[in-house]
Every structure is written in structure tokens, then in C-alpha cells.
Amino acid sequence: RDQPRSRGLGDVYKRQHQMWLDGLYMGAPFYAEYAFRNNLPKDYADIINQFVTCARHTYDPKNGLYRHACDVSRTERWADPVTGQSKHCWGRAMGWYAMALVDALDFIPKHETGRDSLLAILNNIAVQVKKLQDPKTGGWYQVMDRSGDQGNYVESSCSAMFIYSLFKAVRKGYIDKSYLDVALKGYKGFLDNFIKVDRNGLVTITKACAVAGLGGKVYRSGDYDYYINETIRNNDPKVVGPFIMASLEYERLQK
């Protein structure tokens, strides 16, 4: 509640006047659980508003996706001069946002006004994720609005995040059961394409984008070439954690 706010937006993630998709995971699930465990029902409206506001400012009606961030001041070079949106949908940003939704929904009561808006956003994400799933690997691309384009690649961290989100959303009844097939295809593809086990049994998870952002001292333009040329590395915590979470959801299915 005391987190600094951007004018016309929600919590400040990194900079004033901006809202980033990935920023929702860093605060909203904790906020929702804290409100639930401490009997603070008035906070639910604020939590819901965080998600809805971010979705509204980052939504791209041309493809149904959500772009990485929005700058309502329109002063950043990466921001569209009309919408304030960044140029692309970064897979991991949308993955963080999807995970934030399914985790926060656990603690927001079914009768809460606005909860249906979160379910609608989550269902739209499920539709787009199904549509953009790579048929060969079962994963998702680093730059989702340029899936399959030259230089783009199927990236492991966003893939793990979408798999987890779909598994959990199906289990909790947030989305239709038909999306289980998408999650299962993604999980099998993840094992086949991103998991390497050496002769000593050491597991490596490959092809994770190390980091991506916007602006900063070494300016990050947010254009297509920027995203596809960021460092790729193995065993990044941002893929290890979501893959473990996805695996726990998968194992629930086997019981």
C-alpha cells in the first residue's frame, strides 16, 4: 500500500511513469497472500487494479499480446509517441505476468469485484499462448510477436513460465481443460529440447535469456535486434525456478 505509484498507473517497478509486465510478479502475488492472511479485504481492489491497469496499457490489439512495458510520459526513446508502449512482446515478461495472475488468484475471493477481469486477461493469454506455441519444440519464442522470424529463437524461461501457468490455471479451473494438451506438449518439448544430462547425471537447462530490459545507462532500445542479441545462458535461475514449479504441477497430474 505504501509502494510509490506512477501517475495514472500502479506500483513503481523501476521508474516513475512506467509499468512493466514483469514487475507484477515481483509484488502482486505477495501482496495478495499478505492481504488474505492478514484479513485485509480492502486491498484486493488495489491488487486487481494493478493487473488490469498494466494489461490495459500494454495490450496490443493487433495480435492480442501484451508488450513488455509502457511509459505514460512518452519520454523514453523506446516508447511509442502515441501509446507509450514498448516495441515488442518479450516472452519472459508475459510469462512473469501469467505466473503472477495464477498465483495471485489463489488468494483473491471468488466474490471480489473485478476478479472476473483477471480471469478474462488470463484466458486471453491462454488463447495467444496456444496460438503461438512452436509446433516443433512445444516452446515459445523470445520475441513473441515475431515468432519464427530470422534470428528469433525458442527460449526456455518463458516456455517454463507458460507451462507452469497453464498447468496451474487448468487445475484451478481458471481456464478450459483443453489447454492441458498445450501444457503437456510444452512440458514434453521442454524435456526434449532444453534439458541436458551428462554422464554423471548433472542436469543443465539450456537457452535462457540472461536478462532484458528497457532504457538504462547502457541504453536498451527494446527493438527486435536488441532482444534477440541479449546473452543466452544455461541454468539461469529465472528458468530453473519456473521449471521446478511446472514439474511440481505436472507431478500433481500423475497422482
Where are these regions (language model features)?
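Extended, well-ordered alpha-helical scaffold segments
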Residues: 1, 40-57, 111-129, 175-193
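CBM-like carbohydrate-recognition segments
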Residues: 1, 154, 158, 163, ...
